[in-house]
Amino acid sequence: MNPFPRAELDAAFANYQQVVDEIATSREWERFADLFTPDATYIEHAYGTFQGRAEIREWIVRTMTTFPGSSMVAFPPRWSVIDEERGWVVCEIRNIMADPGDRSVHEEPNITILRYAGEGLFASEEDVYNPMRYLPMVRDWAMVANAHGRLPSNAHRWMETYAPGWNG
């Protein structure tokens, strides 16, 4: 049985969402690690497992300041479920790219599992997604952005690697 009341879990997840929303605007990704306990674990299936705030901070800053993370502008949850018995929050997060110039929306979701530790902090986060869908979404976004003169300069090397035949 979870020792945390439902209201505390709700408040912690609301704070998580608010902080991520603020970070998406400010681009101060180093703040993200402060949502976790000092010994937290972050599992990201494509990038690996990160132990502790320092590793989480280093990874998130590096990931979100280089393409394609640097072109993601919003991460709202589509839905969420709170498992009171375990103290978990499970949600679907929309990873939304910036407007590529034609107002089209390019996004790919992931499932996030947050394990609550108390005092407003999470002990772990695990992100689960399908890279076979994520990569084509980013490629499609980049093609549209390039056609509208809005492809960031740091995206060219990524496109050369993940979009064979691209000659932007």
Q: Residue locations for each model-derived region?
A:
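Low-complexity, intrinsically disordered terminal/linker segments enriched in charged
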Residues: E126-G168
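Short, cysteine-centered beta-strand-loop-beta hairpins and adjacent loop/turn segments enriched
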Residues: T65-S70, I96-E107
